[in-house]
Amino acid sequence: ALVGPSGMILADGTPVQFPAHAKPVLTGPSGIVFSNGQNIQLH
């Protein structure tokens, strides 16, 4: 995966856009939790 300040590209090529004004605070193998409480489930 490639991770940048505004999003990431997963190993399979799927782009993930991070929520505006939120930073990833917890990253694990199955998802990401952001500073605003939103979470993204990874494949």
Curated annotation (Swiss-Prot):
Keywords: Cuticle, Repeat. InterPro entries: Cuticle_1. Calcified shell. The keyword Repeat applies. Sequence repeats lie at residues 1-18, 25-42. Pfam families: Cuticle_1. GO terms for molecular function: structural constituent of cuticle. This is Cuticle protein CP434.
